[in-house]
């Protein structure tokens, strides 16, 4: 068994790294309407979830022990309101020696968790359970490594 350690990337080249991750949260139609109409008691769900996702991307190496601290150059969290829920798409870019998919995964995951937290009051049934609410399909939809003149 090997010891836990951060992988040595010192000999790798600095290149442009990009990762795009999406995830989905299924919500009740009534909750979606509250989000659209900005009637959620905790505030603007879209703005808060985007902000949480961006912050999460920046905090990834503090949350996931073996992640390298990467100087992120771009983080975008897009949230699309769909018929049965919200889709979160996070894009992260950096010129570095290792990929940024963990940062994009973290951004999407935390944005989805933030949405759940902000609307949980409206999602509970009469027993305080969440029979309809579901976070699903968190996946890397694109990972790009672009070689340019950065070294």
Curated annotation (Swiss-Prot):
Record-annotated active site: 117
Protein keywords: Lyase, Molybdenum cofactor biosynthesis
Enzyme class, UniProt record, top EC level: lyase
Pathway: Cofactor biosynthesis; molybdopterin biosynthesis
Gene Ontology BP annotations: Mo-molybdopterin cofactor biosynthetic process
Pfam family, one: MoaC
Its EC number(s): 4.6.1.17
Family matches, as Gene3D superfamilies: Molybdopterin cofactor biosynthesis C (MoaC) domain (3.30.70.640)
Binding-site list for substrate: 66-68, 102-103
Listed GO MF terms: cyclic pyranopterin monophosphate synthase activity; GTP 3',8'-cyclase activity
Reactions catalysed: (8S)-3',8-cyclo-7,8-dihydroguanosine 5'-triphosphate = cyclic pyranopterin phosphate + diphosphate
Function comment: Catalyzes the conversion of (8S)-3',8-cyclo-7,8-dihydroguanosine 5'-triphosphate to cyclic pyranopterin monophosphate (cPMP).
Quaternary structure and interacting proteins, as annotated: Homohexamer; trimer of dimers.
The family this protein is said to belong to: Belongs to the MoaC family.
PANTHER family for this protein: MOLYBDENUM COFACTOR BIOSYNTHESIS PROTEIN 1 (PTHR22960:SF0), MOLYBDOPTERIN COFACTOR SYNTHESIS PROTEIN A (PTHR22960)
Protein's UniProt name: Probable cyclic pyranopterin monophosphate synthase
Gene that this polypeptide is encoded by: moaC
């Amino acid at each position: 068994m090997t010891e836990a350690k951060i992988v040595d990337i010192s000999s790798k080249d600095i290149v442009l790294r990009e990762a795009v991750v999406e995830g989905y949260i299924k919500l009740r139609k009534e909750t979606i309407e509250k989000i659209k109409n900005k009637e959620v008691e905790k505030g603007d769900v879209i703005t808060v979830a985007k902000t949480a996702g961006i912050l999460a991307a920046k905090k990834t190496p503090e949350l996931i022990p073996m992640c390298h601290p990467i100087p992120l150059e771009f983080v975008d969290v897009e949230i699309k309101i769909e018929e049965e829920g919200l889709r979160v798409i996070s894009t992260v870019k950096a010129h570095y020696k290792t990929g940024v998919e963990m940062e994009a995964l973290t951004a999407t995951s935390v944005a989805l968790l933030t949405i759940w937290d902000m609307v949980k009051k409206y999602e509970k049934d009469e027993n305080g359970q969440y029979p309809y609410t579901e976070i699903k399909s968190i996946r890397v939809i694109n990972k790009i490594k672009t070689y340019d003149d950065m070294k």
